[in-house]
Amino acid sequence: MEKAHRPTHSKAIVFVLVAVVSGTLMDTLLKVAGAHVGTWQLLVLRWSFALLVLLPVILTGSAGSMHIQSWRVHIARGLLNCLGSYALFYALATLPLSVVITILFAEPLFVIPFAVLILHEQVGTKDVLAALLGLVGVVVMSQPDVSQGDWKMLLPLVAASSFALLNVLTKKWGAQESPVSLMLWMAVSTLLITIPFAASQWVELRWQDYGMALAIAVLGSVYSYFWIVGLRMGNVAKLTQLSFLSLPLAFGLGWAFFHEAPGAVTVWGALIIAAAVMLLSMNMARVKTAHVFLRRLFKPAKS
């Protein structure tokens, strides 16, 4: 059994690593594109190309059923995705890459209160401490700017909390649909919401902008698929710790491409948030099976 388990876990590690790198590269391209493209227009381009990326999988029938269980679920997910994505895209265009990704990294910590309120799940003292510690890290990173009236530092916080709530709602109501179906209707609902806003301020784009939007969509789809499948194959409590690689990767990309040298406050905030997520992961490793953590955060559950 253990020999059979090792190749699967090794494959899971590769999948999660691919997801982490793809997600960080996607955020980097979003920052580049945000300098030339408006946020609403970029949202439309990102999800239009995401829809095109999914179409071959859907048309071949390899993605399973596209049956919709509840339109309310997809509308709610679309609204949350619009809110989170808009906040993320605007934050990436106006804030240092390392700051945005570090605060967004605290997303699992925001799942805890939503899981209690919506799923009525019980959480331990260490879970609460991890969430509070992560909040301290966010405050440390954002306090200097917010105290000076720069509220843009709150945008990554809005994005992280929106995506956390989206994950919890997916767990509560999305079990009877395939992952590709959830991705498809997410793209459709997001486009229906964003197109009217983008149409009023649409500007002519360069071919490079369209190419960048396509690359962003591909990287986003790769991230979503490899992250979900990787976590389902392996020990989630261990695999999620690989996501820490996104922090040094974001710091390195920010320094190399945007000449962003992180200050002491940013580094301290990043360390505190990383410690909080590590505490949460270590606590989850002590439960009877890591799949409890998987079901709590990532795998949709039957309503």
Show where each model-derived region lies.
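C-terminal-most transmembrane helix of multi-pass membrane proteins
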Residues: E2, P248-S303
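Membrane-interface helix-cap regions at the ends of transmembrane helices
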Residues: E2-K3, L51-Q69, V136-Q148, T190-D209, ...
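Transmembrane alpha-helices of multi-pass small-molecule transport proteins
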Residues: K11-F15, H36-L83, S162-L166, W185-S200
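Loop-to-transmembrane-helix transition segments
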Residues: K11-V18, I58-L59, A63-A87, W151-A159, ...
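Transmembrane alpha-helical segments that form core, pore/gating elements
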Residues: T28-K31, T39-W40, L54, D145-L205, ...
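Alpha-helical transmembrane segments of compact multi-pass small-molecule transporters, enriched
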Residues: F49-V53, I103-L117, L132-L133, S189-I193, ...
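Helix-helix packing/entry segments at the starts of transmembrane helices
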Residues: V100-A106, W173-V188, S224-A256
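Loop-to-transmembrane alpha-helix entry segments
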Residues: I101-L104, H120-V140, V146, D150-M153, ...
